[in-house]
UniProtKB/Swiss-Prot annotation:
Its EC number is 2.1.1.199. It comes from Streptomyces coelicolor (strain ATCC BAA-471 / A3(2) / M145). The keyword Transferase applies. HAMAP family: 16SrRNA_methyltr_H. The gene is rsmH. The lineage of its organism: Bacteria, Bacillati, Actinomycetota, Actinomycetes, Kitasatosporales. The keyword Membrane does not apply. This is Ribosomal RNA small subunit methyltransferase H. GO terms for biological process: rRNA base methylation.
Length: 310
């Protein structure tokens, strides 16, 4: 999704032999493969919390040998990963946020509301609470907060009332029952807007289960710090909460923070980042026609223009 634009955005920073680029969201390795192909002198470090994704992408990237280093890690662990690898600074960082197509297409992971599956939704299935556990154990007020904050679901109270009523009869295990419950709970008018009525609830549960926003909140500033001066970072996000967070970090880095009235701006107040996109760039109609999952994508890019001081 918008891969070509991401590569073009990172290109000026990845021409030098030995440049290091980080793919923070490896998935099935499509972006990593494209980075290795496009920048034959670059080395790749790629992260994923999903062990199955690492196995499959490892096979895909095997022809690139020692140029690719794959690491089982969450992307907010980037500073630790680079430290372990002895890489002080990198020249490029790419994030493609959201669920990989593999996770969406694998029925037994429970990410998709279009097919019945166990309510799991963990990107790393070896750790943490599943979506079913969240639904069955969280207090009603907490569930309402999650649906509102992470799903921007206006009918959160109505949905949670139905969930609490149903879970007392029998705990939730599968996605189809939840989808049906949401359909039944929503007023007719709410069902007419924006696709499957379960979409927002599933998004909210996925974000909660994987701690996505809190991880991202730590990951983007950490990625900015790991980029050398002249290095670049590109972020593809898929909903407004992610995009807003990326926008805030980039805008803060690109701001002049000097107190008003100074005749000369000392370096510690000067911007650390230069924005590379005007607002968020959207996918083209062709990209959406080719892959409908690209429709909500938003791309932002920034270049590191000075070191942090003090």
């Amino acid at each position: 999704m918008m891969l070509q634009r991401c590569l073009d955005l990172l290109a000026p920073a990845l021409q030098e032999p030995g440049a290091v680029v980080v793919d923070c969201t490896l998935g099935l390795g499509g972006h990593s493969e494209a980075l290795l192909e496009r920048f034959p002198e670059a080395r790749l470090v790629a992260l994923d919390r999903d062990k199955e994704a690492l196995r499959l992408s490892g096979e895909r990237l095997a022809p690139y040998g020692g140029r690719a280093t794959l690491v089982h890690a969450v992307y907010d662990e980037l500073p630790d990963v680079l430290d372990r690898l002895g890489v002080p600074r990198v020249q490029g960082v790419l994030f493609d946020l959201g669920v990989s197509s593999m996770q969406l297409d694998e029925a037994d992971r429970g990410f998709a509301y279009a097919q019945d599956a166990p309510l799991d939704m963990r990107m790393d299935q070896s750790t943490g609470m599943s979506a079913a556990e969240v639904l069955n154990t969280y207090p009603p007020g907490e569930l309402v907060r999650i649906l509102r904050a992470y799903g921007e679901e206006k009918q959160a109270k109505r949905i949670v009332s139905a969930v609490v009523r149903e879970r007392e009869k029998e705990p939730f295990t599968n996605s189809a029952r939840l989808v049906e419950l949401i359909r039944a709970a929503l007023p007719q008018a709410a069902k007419r807007t924006g696709g499957n009525p379960a979409k927002r609830t599933f998004q909210a549960l996925r974000i909660e289960v994987n701690g996505e926003l809190s991880v991202l909140e730590r990951a983007i500033p950490a990625a900015v710090e790991s980029v050398a001066v002249g290095g670049r970072i590109a972020v593809l996000s898929y909903h407004s909460l992610e995009d807003r967070l990326v926008k805030q970090v980039f805008a803060a880095g690109a701001a002049n923070t000097a107190p008003p009235g100074l005749p000369v701006v000392p370096e510690q107040y000067a911007p650390r980042l230069k924005l590379l996109t005007r607002g968020a760039e959207l996918p083209t109609e062709e990209e959406i026609a080719e892959n409908r999952r690209a429709a909500p994508a938003r791309l932002r890019g920034a270049e590191r223009i000075r070191e942090s001081l003090g």
